[in-house]
Each structure stands twice: as structure tokens, then as C-alpha cells.
Amino acid sequence: MALIDVAISCLNSIREIEEDVKDAIVYIDAGCTESFQFVGAFPLFLELGARAVCSLENMTSLDAVADWNSKSDCAKRIVIMTSRLLNDAHRYMLRCLSTHEGVQRCTVFTSISEGSHSAIPDSPLGPDAYREYETLLVQDYNEHTKKSDKISKDKGVSKFSSALESLTMEPIESENVDISSGGAQGLVVSVHHFPLIICPFTPRAFVLPSQGSVAEASLSRQHEDSLSFGLPPISTGSMSDTDDVPPGATLTAHFLYQLALKMELKLEIFSLGDQSKNVGKILTDMSSVYDVARRKRSAGLLLVDRTLDLITPCCHGDSLFDRIFSSLPRAERFSSQAQLKQGVPSINRPSLDVQVPLGELLNEEPSKIRDSGLPEGIEAFLRGWDSYTSAPQNVGLFNECDKKSTTNWTELLNGSLVATECFRGTPYLEAMIDRKTKDGSVLVKKWLQEALRRENISVNVRARPGYATKPELQAMIKALSQSQSSLLKNKGIIQLGAATAAALDESQSAKWDTFSSAEMMLNVSAGDTSQGLAAQISDLINKSAVAELQAKKNEKPDSSSRGLLSFRDALLLTIVGYILAGENFPTSGSGGPFSWQEEHFLKEAIVDAVLENPSAGNLKFLNGLTEELEGRLNRLKSEETKEIPSDDQLDIDALDDDPWGKWGDEEEEEVDNSKADESYDDMQLKLDLRDRVDSLFRFLHKLSSLRTRNLPLREGSLASESSFPGEPSGNKGLVYRLITKVLSKQEIPGLEYHSSTVGRFIKSGFGRFGLGQAKPSLADQSVILVFVIGGINGIEVLEAQEAVSESGRPDINLVIGGTTLLTPDDMFELLLGQFSHF
């Protein structure tokens, strides 16, 4: 039976819309851009006959000029692909149509189904969402066209923007709407569903676009069991009514349902965690007898709440893939236009579009770069491309000085990771993500060496067998990039090699290794005593505060400070420490895992660190206090400066014993009063700070109670086994432990099976005669899809494949997915950032 390949399925879905893409300008939003970059879809669009592939958010009228298929006539068709709800992408689509006034047909593809649009609260669209939106878009286009006719042409773009901002999307009243979508002076609008807008890292591992509506939607509402808008709530067993589930759960259920339809899978649904049960129930309710009959292949779907295992994505595991995504800069995300509905915000997750620094590798010889004429060519291109939207003074980026010129143009030469790039049929990313850091980097080095042999290129570089370093990777990449033919032929391994070299850079790898060592020490201390663990956390906070303060004094940290942790980093380790403490120590009388005295020392360490450097970390729990704390610190520094007399200052009072000169009793009294007021303000400020720190620790108590409050973890068989490092699964994440138990057919506490429609019918109809259907097992399925609601990281993908390999079941086709890709920094933002519930 053929293996499932989600990346190839995405490409096949694009081929299915060839008739719409042919001879059209294709606009894709930021979420689709993330997806299509991983899939490697841009060459396919041009192969199918697209005139150009352009950004929907950054569209200009010049997009019609960039015709890659050399069409002499004007474009009459536009295709818009979006990963957002139609109402969220509306203003971009309207601007696109209004700019290309000669367009006669607009085809919209959205990854959000009609059912999702009608299921979201406060949605302006109903069950017939696509048809309604076709009419609405034509109406708003007509309205804008009428307004534009009244605007003087010499006022240009600014007037267009103001007219566009006045257009809003209101619910459609059926009696006032002309159902025809083709009544706008020949403009025909059609809306279709395109479900496979996902970001596949490998053929069997994917996440959702971070700038799409599903990933941005909230996964919990604020209540006592919730931790963050971007994470499911704690699974206490009190499953909420599905009518009140957050929008993220609803959109996730609809996405998985449509994914199964597209992949022709009949799902047997299992869930672990309260939010997963909600999603499973929605999925089951959406199923019907006809859906089951249409699907060809049986598969098991295991839904898992991220909140059941927060420590894995918080830690810095041995994964080259995770190092790359944590080290490389990301593309700037576009601001979400999703409105705050019912007190639930959209989550601004970091873009998945990593910026591979290819330009930096070519920046070593500026003189050769200048002689090649490349900067002038890029400047000429930018002048022509940006002349419509950019001021003349902003276009000549390369004429200020040679150094700045070289820096600017190299920023344009950023690469990206593509999941479909292969080496002899093996996808680069798949082979790398299935290996740990050392093995993965050595594999990348071997691929580069093989590419050099194929191109007959020799490189004089000192290499250590069994190791890969940044200098040798850079030398090989630069040699492969000397000619255009070699660069294009080997672009996949060149980009991956550059990403690996950036992750192995000392400034990045030293800090990651420091994190990893600190987490290991916390793990060891958690297996000993609470006093030792508390002392370890306190030491990390104190050292990080001192290091950051020293770096601030030096303005620029020198090389000796590389690898040192910041105060923000220490807070992330504090989260890890509290979760470990909750798993290993019983709750003390203070409500947390530590005694009152142990926790008091931790609080004092954080208070002292904040008082010494209030701006460190840009922390949510200091909102509203940071400026006051900075003012206090600056005042104390200025007073210290005044108290130190200069060497040439003459002390008159020391030369004259006659105290009559000190006549300013009133002035001294005013100074004393002022100092008393300042002292009172300082005391009040410290009290406010301690209150904030107390609220932080109440949130840490909630994190430490995850094992006791999460119902599936109470029995202990799924909980972290960090205190037994000799066990094979001792330091593995929850996904590994789940898959291991599933494939060995062990009982999993809290795992719920959601009967299909046919199963419920058989159970209710024939069950009374003793002919009820037996509960299926996930292990009996040849295809298993594990989806983590809240997100996954690279180490979990690696461990999932390890679990399958160790099970001795090569017939199992395992696919792992998640809401988004999580890094430790992402977890910090979710737990202590603006979307946290503490």
C-alpha cells in the first residue's frame, strides 16, 4: 500500500486547479506563502501557465508587468489563494480587484471551509458562505468603483487608501442582495475550497501556516484552568459544551475533517485531553454515512492536547532542526486583521519562513562583489519595481557607501527551506529532521561533499572526520555557489548547508548548549530534593541578572559573554524547574512544590534582578511598572554621581569651621521632604513589584500542578519519567510515550474513542441483541495520524519515528502534525507573554 506523502498531496492539489491558474496572475497571502515555500510550489505555478505569483498583502499594479510566461496581452484573470477566513482577507482582495480594473474574472481559493465560516461566532457569513461572499465582493467592488470615479486622479494612492478603509464587511440581507455574482460590469467572482494549505517539513510531518486563520485562532477562553490563548486548557476532566468551544478548536476540527476527505481517509478518532475531546466530538458530529462510504482507506486519528506535555517544547533538545528554527531570523509577519471577538484574540505566531543567510556567505570579498556589477543590477531592479510605491530618496539604497551597499544587497539574498528538495530521492529535510544535531550536521556535510564531487570542484579545507563545523561548511557552500549553473542545480543543499552553518555558529550553539546543560542540571536536581532544585533555580536567576547587567554596562557583549543566559532565559528555566518540581515533589503548604522559605528566596532573586535591570526581558508581568522602575534606577544612579566629589572641587565648609554659612534651613527642610517623598514612592513601587512577582508565582504554581490536575497524567503511566534516566523512555516526550504504548497495545488512561456514525448506529441498533461493535484499536490501523493541538517541535517528530522503528512495525505509516511549530522562545511568549492568562 502506498505511503502517505502530504507534500506531494499539496502539489497534486495545485495541479488540480490548472485551468484556473493558467494565464492568470496568482496572488497568495502570507499563510499560503509559508506553505508553498515548504512545498516548493512556485515553479509548479509557472509550469501550469501562471503569469506571475505575487504577494496579496504587498500587491501593486506593477504585478501585471512581471509576466513570466511572456504574454503580450493584458491579464484578464486573477487567482487569489488565502489561508484566512474570507472576511479577514476581504480588504486585501478588494484592493487587488480595484487595482487591476481590467480583470474580468476573479477566482478565490480559501483553506477555510464553508462550514468553518458559519461555525465561527459573529461571522458575517452563513452556511452558504462562498456564494454569499461572491455577491458581497462584487457589491463592495461596485461601491468602491463608484467612489473612485469621484476622486481626483492627481491625488493618487492616498485617496484610494482612504476610500478603501471606509468599506466594511456587514452581514448580507437576502432581500436586498442580487444573487448573481456576475453583475459588476463583466466581473465574475467564484469562491472554492482548497484545504491542503499546510507546511510539510517532511512527507509525513506538517504544521499549519502560522499566519493562517486556524493557527491564529484562540485555543482556550480565559478561566481558572487555562494557561494561554495559544494553548489548550488543563485537562481536568470537566469537558465544556461544544457550543462554547474556542474558535481554534472549531477551525481545527473542520480542517482535519476536510484533510481526511481530501486524502480519502476513513478516520477512527481517539482523543487525549479535554480540548482534544471537544475537537473529536465536532469531527464525529460532522461525519455521515455517505462520507464513510466515499472514503477508501481506514486510518486512526489521535488528538493530543499540548498542555499534557509543556516541558518538551520548553526545553532545548538534541535536534538540528530545532536549532535551525531557533537560530535563524524569521520573515516579518503581516499584522492580522482578525477582530477581537467575544474577548478572544488572535494569536500572532512567528512566521515559519526562516531567512537562510545566503548573502552573508558571499560577503567576504566586497571588492569582487562590486566589480561584478551585481549591486548595480539589484539597484536598477529595485528602481523599476518600487518606483510606484517608493519615494526616490528611499530607492537608492546602494549609493551611500561601499560597506553599507554590500550589507544591504546581501540581505536580499535570503534562502528558505524546501521540503521537496531531494538527494537521490531522499528529501533533505526529512533525512535531517530524523537525526540528532551531530549526525544531522555530518549528513549535511556529506551531501555537500557529494555535490562538489559531481561538479568536479575541489575545496582546500581542513575537515575532521565525524564532525561538521561552520568554517568547512561555509567553504564548501561558497565553492558550490561560484557558478550560476552549480548554484541553481544544488540550491537545495546549499540553502540547507547555509542554515546548518548558521545554527552551528558559536554565538548560537554556545547558548543552546548552555540551555541544554542547565536543563539537565535541573532534571538531576529534581530527582534529589526540593531544596537543591530551588537553589539551582535561584542560582540561575542571580547569575543571569549579573551577566545581563554587565553586558548592558559594556553596551556590546564581548566574545567571552557568549553562551551566557539572560534574565528572560532564566525565567524560562524557572518554568521548566517548576514543572519538574510538580512532577517530583508533593505540593507544600504554600500551594507550590517548594517550601515558603525556598520560594521566598526565589521571589527575592527575581525582585532584585528586576530592580537592577527593569527593562530586561520586556516582561508582561511588569507592564505599567517598567517606566517607573527605570526612572527610579536612573535617579539612584544620578544621586550616586552627585555624592562622589571631584578631585578639584573646593570644600569651603572644610576650610571654615564657622557654620554661619549654612543658613538655608528652609531649603534643607524642603530637600528632606523631597527625599521622604522619594523614599515613600520607592517603597510603594517595591510593594507593587512584589505584588506582580506574587502573581507570577501563582501562575508557576498552576504550571507545577499540571501532573495532578491533568486527568490523564494522574495515574503516572504517561507522566514524565525523568527520575529514571536508565529507562529508554526516561527523557522522551509525551508523543514518544503515547506512540510506544499505542503500538504495544497498552492501556492509555484518559484515551477516549469517538464512535463513527455507523458505529453509533450499530451500537444503538444491534447492541441490544449482544451484537455491539468492539472498540477498535489504534494499533490495528496501518495509517496513524497524530495531531497535537497547540503545536509540535522537531525533537517530537524525531522521537515519533524512533517509537515506530523500535516497535518492529515497519508497516505503520505514521503522520504527525500540529497547530504550529514551537520553539522555546515561542513557549515563553505563550506562557509569560501577552497571550498568557496569569
Curated annotation (Swiss-Prot):
Its main location: endoplasmic reticulum. Keywords: Endoplasmic reticulum, Membrane, Protein transport, Transport. Residues 646-658 have a biased composition (Acidic residues). One of its GO terms (cellular component) is vacuole. The keyword Thylakoid does not apply. It is a peripheral membrane protein. Disruption phenotype: Accumulation of the precursors of the two major storage proteins albumin 2S and globulin 12S in dry seeds. GO terms for biological process: protein maturation; protein transport; vacuolar protein processing; vesicle-mediated transport. Belongs to the STXBP/unc-18/SEC1 family. Forms a complex with MAG2, ZW10/MIP1 and MIP2 on the endoplasmic reticulum. Required for proper maturation of seed storage proteins. Forms a complex with MAG2, ZW10/MIP1 and MIP2 on the endoplasmic reticulum that may be responsible for efficient transport of seed storage proteins. PANTHER family: VESICLE PROTEIN SORTING-ASSOCIATED. This is Sec1 family domain-containing protein MIP3. It comes from Arabidopsis thaliana (Mouse-ear cress). The lineage of its organism: Eukaryota, Viridiplantae, Streptophyta, Embryophyta, Tracheophyta.
